[in-house]
């Protein structure tokens, strides 16, 4: 919950009591530390907490085939190239991991993705790929808010920039 003020999204006042409330509205977050499970495959990371299931009698079990198929389709849509959705995240480069975190945030009809320092820990070559991915999100109608100290990256992908200093808005540009 905000410590102060109100939250409006698409013109409606919203009260968010949990991360699930945010997700249900189409608001997602990509954290600076990525919050990926390195020991799990890419597909399972994308669906973590929202895994498709199938019925086995009275039990529900994870549908690994569907996880793989849906993950690969989503990665293709975003033009993210990996060997397989079965590949473990710990085997990926920093840029690929960032791409998987972005794929996870956009896999469920996201309307707005907030990214905290999406290029901070990446090599220059990988930065370009992540910026291309962010531009691709814009093309498919996903709004993106980027929190970053790398102004070159901001100017490369943002349509509007707001600079904050100690919580105060001190500059804006379009």
PLM features per residue range, with description:
Residues 1-174:
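Glycine-rich phosphate-binding loops of nucleotide-dependent enzymes
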């Amino acid at each position: 919950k905000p410590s102060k003020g109100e939250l409006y999204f698409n013109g409606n006042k919203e009260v968010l009591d949990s991360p699930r409330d945010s997700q249900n509205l189409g608001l997602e977050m990509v954290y600076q530390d990525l919050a990926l499970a390195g020991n799990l495959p890419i597909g399972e990371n994308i669906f973590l907490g929202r895994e498709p299931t199938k019925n086995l009698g009275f039990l529900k079990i994870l549908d690994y085939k569907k996880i793989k198929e849906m993950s690969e389709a989503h990665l293709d849509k975003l033009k993210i190239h990996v060997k397989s959705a079965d590949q473990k995240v710990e085997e990926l480069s920093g840029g690929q991991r960032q791409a998987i975190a972005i794929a996870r945030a956009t896999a469920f009809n996201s309307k707005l993705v907030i990214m905290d320092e999406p290029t901070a820990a990446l090599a220059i070559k990988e930065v370009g790929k992540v910026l291309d991915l962010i531009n691709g999100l814009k093309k498919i109608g996903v709004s993106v808010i980027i929190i970053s100290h790398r102004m070159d990256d901001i100017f490369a992908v943002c349509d509007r920039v707001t600079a904050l200093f100690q919580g105060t808005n001190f500059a804006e540009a379009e």
